[in-house]
């Protein structure tokens, strides 16, 4: 990793799994992180773990974790996530699109249209919307910005 002191990161799907690990590592390296997923209580548990961790930062100071629950399938909720992140932390420096869903398990030949649409909306469209909301602000500040979309088993 590298020195993230003074940087603010929004990480979707960060209450558990890969997203939680990313948030924990970024906070350890100095970034303030937004813990976001659908379940506020699980987000709070993750934020508390990060904020109360005794792990030593290689840079002397850890970042803080805040909670902003969000259902990525709702564009209004995504707008609120961005607005609230800016309100509580300031500029957004890092965006990690980790949240995803898969309402169907089985062969692609059997997937119902509704399930396919949900997968596309949650795993593609929501990330596109979030990027459109955040990346322009990043590009205004610098030619180098950080955005990460994680391909998962749920991705196309």
What are these regions (language model features)?
Residues 40, 69-81, 113:
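The beta1-alpha1 cofactor-binding region of Rossmann-like NAD(H)/NADP(H)-dependent oxidoreductases
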